């Protein structure tokens, strides 16, 4: 999957663990299967925007916190 999906998935996992929430608990709150949430976290499938907002709400964070990806350093010519 894309680098963006992978990074968003990492953010979901990080915040879920900070909240001491299990995959099962997050899945139940957002009405998705445990398998689907696991795939989101592993970047195997993209998260649609509506689900991203539901996840952010379940984790009690701003959706922007899930969208943060470290900047990539481009090799620009001198």
Segments from the language model and where they lie:
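Short, charged recognition helix plus adjacent turn
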Residues: 2, 67-78
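Short amphipathic helical patch at the helix-1/turn junction of helix-turn-helix
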Residues: 6, 17-18, 46
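Short basic helix-loop element that most often maps to the first helix and adjoining turn
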Residues: 10-29, 54
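Conserved hydrophobic/aromatic packing and binding residues within compact polymer-binding modules
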Residues: 12, 26-27, 37-40, 66
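DNA major-groove recognition helix of helix-turn-helix/homeodomain DNA-binding modules
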Residues: 31, 50-65
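Recognition helix of helix-turn-helix/homeodomain-like DNA-binding domains
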Residues: 31-45
